Amino acid sequence: MKQKLNTVMLQEIEAVHSLLLELEEQHRCIIVNDIFALEACVGKIKDANKNIAYIEVERRKLTENRAMTEIVEELRDEKLESNYHKIKQLLQEVILQKDTNELLIKQGLSFTNRILNVLNPVRETKTYNAYGKVKK
């Protein structure tokens, strides 16, 4: 079981690393405003996520839905522990990159909306409601 689990974890490291590379490519596309390449990144990211999910199912079959920390402590294998920490570190990097990309996209959308409001302002008269807030 130890060898099989180690093999599956190595596959998982490779899959998560490929997802990280795709997210970095998405980041590059966001920075240079390459919309068509950004659209192509979406499909690649989905494929990488499917691959990770498949490998995760394989790992859960091997571990019988037990927690990985419990298994790593029980088996006390250096390679297994090293791979476990590599996966955790890669996952943190993926989360950071994903959050950065989402923030940049939201920032770009906010900027675009402000520019549109400057170019085409709302022509309605502003009225106040009972709470003193401006209705939109």
PLM regions: where:
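Extended, charge-rich alpha-helical scaffolding segments
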Residues: K2-L75
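Short terminal interaction segments
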Residues: E73, D77-K136
